[in-house]
Structures are given as C-alpha cells and as structure tokens.
C-alpha cells in the first residue's frame, strides 16, 4: 500500500510578488526549493495564512538568494504582497519506506524568506 504523505514544506513565507499576467505558477527562491526538496514543475499546494485561501499550482525557480515567493497567473488573485503562506508538496510513499524511517523536509523562514531552520517532523500538538 502507498500513502499520500507530506514530502516538503516551506512554512510561513511572505509573498513578495503577485504577477497576474505571467504564465501561471509560483516562483520560489532556488535556495528554498533545494532546502525543501521541491523541484521545478512539481505540483505544490499553497495555503494563505492571512485569508484562508488554499490552492494548487506548480513550482518554478526564482532567483537564488532573493527570498522570492511570486504568485503568478490566477494564483496572484489568491494573496496580497506580504501575506504569509505555507507551501507544501506531497508524495506517494510505500509502507516499506515509511517503516524504514522516511521523513519530510520542512523549512522555516524569517521575515525576509531566508532559511532560519529545518527539521524532518511536525511536533506533537499539545493542549497548553
């Protein structure tokens, strides 16, 4: 059996560009793509923390080191500059890989979309 699992996440990145008339996609700083293990043309889901919008598109390379998160085409209507978004990619993982210790790549960024940390799991949520 295979399970649809979180593979990659860029957490709380700020939208830097909204390009309505650019061919659809999301341009992401190449440093962030590599850190999160997202490849060009891979399907991504984007969740807007500010307004609750959730949508899918595909990733393209943004200028390395720029902090770019550019929503292009119709995706540009789903956010405003400065909105915080979570960018996620999923993969089908078989039971053997899961039992062998497969883990996702989670990337956390600062207010300039520079990497401030990473980890391979989502912590257990507690009632506090």
Curated annotation (Swiss-Prot):
GO annotation, biological process: alanine biosynthetic process; pantothenate biosynthetic process
Catalysed reactions, semicolon-separated: L-aspartate + H(+) = beta-alanine + CO2
Residues annotated for substrate binding in this entry: 57, 73-75
Localization (cell): Cytoplasm
Processing and modification events after translation: Is synthesized initially as an inactive proenzyme, which is activated by self-cleavage at a specific serine bond to produce a beta-subunit with a hydroxyl group at its C-terminus and an alpha-subunit with a pyruvoyl group at its N-terminus.
Alphabetized Pfam families for the sequence: Asp_decarbox
GO MF entry, a single one: aspartate 1-decarboxylase activity
A GO CC annotation given for this chain: cytosol
Residue positions where Pyruvic acid (Ser) is found in the record: 25
Record's cofactor remark: Binds 1 pyruvoyl group covalently per subunit.
Obligatory cofactor(s): pyruvate
Active site: 25 (schiff-base intermediate with substrate), 58 (proton donor)
Pathway: Cofactor biosynthesis; (R)-pantothenate biosynthesis; beta-alanine from L-aspartate: step 1/1
InterPro entries hit by this protein: Asp_de-COase-like_dom_sf, Asp_decarbox
EC number, UniProt record: 4.1.1.11
UniProt keyword terms in alphabetical order: Autocatalytic cleavage, Cytoplasm, Decarboxylase, Lyase, Pantothenate biosynthesis, Pyruvate, Schiff base, Zymogen
PANTHER family in UniProt: ASPARTATE 1-DECARBOXYLASE
Complexes and interactors: Heterooctamer of four alpha and four beta subunits.
Family per similarity comment: Belongs to the PanD family.
NCBIfam families in UniProt: panD
Function: Catalyzes the pyruvoyl-dependent decarboxylation of aspartate to produce beta-alanine.
Protein name: Aspartate 1-decarboxylase
Gene from which this protein is expressed: panD
